Amino acid sequence: EARGVIILEVANEVNNVEQDSLVEILSIKSPTLDKIIEQMLTNDDNVTAEMILKEIGFSRTGQGSTGSGLVSLPEILAANDLPNTGLLLIDGSGLSRDNQATCGLFQEILEDSEYGTTIEKALPLVGVEGVVSDVFLGTPFESNLVAHTFFDTDRGALVGSYTTSEGIEVLIT
């Protein structure tokens, strides 16, 4: 009611209702996972990253928690022959300063025939969109590099793909 919504009656709890007797009043179709990942990487959306990790945990253990996702992720990497040596994850958002991953892992993910293309297509274009819209302006990377970056006072990272003036694609980790 504080926002102009007037509630005329109190809701009633109803149990043991037959599914056939229910009437759908609203349906919202979720974007596909590749679009969710694109939004996450373009906007540096840490909440979405954390929620994806929890969903991974739920799909593998039945528990939608950060902990179950953290246990599941190295198993998924190993099952796909991706290296998880040197991988230490504390959260799914990527905000913990204790998270660790190797360049080799990111390189192999980008090179992976099943996942690499999806990730590469989801990365924002440097100098144009999202979290990288204001980096590398006036350089050959502007509009030729799709990347996700992280920069802090004492460290940084960049993962992406650069197309040279000769049309050669170079993966950068």
Positions of predicted regions on the chain:
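A small/polar active-site loop signature that marks catalytic segments
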Residues: 1-117
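C-terminal soluble interaction/assembly domains
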Residues: 72, 85-173
